[in-house]
Design a protein with these regions (language model features):
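Catalytic-site beta-strand/loop segments enriched in glycine and acidic/polar residues
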Residues: 65-73, 186
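Cytosolic-facing regulatory segments adjacent to core modules
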Residues: 61, 84, 92-180
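Helical hairpin unit composed of two closely spaced alpha helices linked by a short loop
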Residues: 181-188
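Pre-Walker A adenine-sensing motif
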Residues: 56-65
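Ser/Thr-centric signal marking residues that sit
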Residues: 54, 78, 83-84
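N-terminal cationic and glycine-rich segments that engage phosphates or anionic surfaces
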Residues: 89
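Short, small/acidic-rich helices and loops at N termini and domain boundaries
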Residues: 1-45, 49, 69, 75, ...
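Short gly/ser/thr-rich secondary-structure transition/capping motifs
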Residues: 53-57, 167-168
Length: 188
């Protein structure tokens, strides 16, 4: 029955998309007026970060923040901190930016991500969190991190091996419930 519901939802979204798929290639002149309008808005703004702040000052200065509809790919060798980097940005977007954030974690269970975020926000060594060997002074920081995360509009889907269509359908469901998402992270 789940497959049937997913297929029906996919078909409904497919029908809805047919009216919004655009008109195909257009001349650049068709985009110039909107581009100039955007530049004018930015010119009159006192904001240095025009997108979503990443919490990484140098990165924000180079990119002006993550811009709507940007696709950002973080690449690196195994165990080089890609997940930690992405989760730090997600934490910042959800907590400091007060934006809904959706995380698809196809390799790591949601509980493990939550523990990493508690470690990060509480500034507690991950080894202590993983082993449960916390000192008395760590517990208030754990409580503070849990409080911040529980207030955040952060959603984790740790279903392994989702297809692009499934990711899209699930993102649309969360968008329908929460409004526009500030960030979608796919950790694969």
């Amino acid at each position: 029955i789940t497959e049937l519901v997913d297929e029906a939802e996919r078909k409904v979204f497919q029908i809805a998309d047919q009216g919004t798929r655009g008109s195909g290639p257009l001349r650049i002149s068709d985009f110039l007026a909107r581009a100039v309008d955007r530049i004018d808005i930015l010119f009159h703004s006192d904001q240095v970060i025009t997108g979503l702040s990443t919490a990484y000052k140098d990165l924000d200065e180079m990119t002006s923040g993550l811009q709507p509809a940007d696709l950002v790919i973080v690449a690196g060798r195994p165990s080089m901190g890609k997940t930690t980097f992405a989760m730090n940005i997600a934490e910042h977007a959800a907590i400091q930016g007060d934006k809904p954030v959706l995380i698809f974690s196809m390799e790591m269970p949601g509980q493990a991500l939550a523990m990493r975020m508690m470690s990060s926000l509480g500034r507690i060594d991950q080894h202590k969190i993983r082993t449960g060997k916390l000192a008395d002074e760590d517990w208030p920081r754990v409580t503070s991190a849990v409080s911040m995360l529980s207030e955040a509009k952060m959603f984790i889907d740790d279903t392994p091996a989702l297809s692009p269509g499934e990711v899209r359908a699930r993102a649309r469901r969360v968008t329908k419930e929460q409004g526009a998402l500030g960030l979608i992270v796919i950790d694969y």
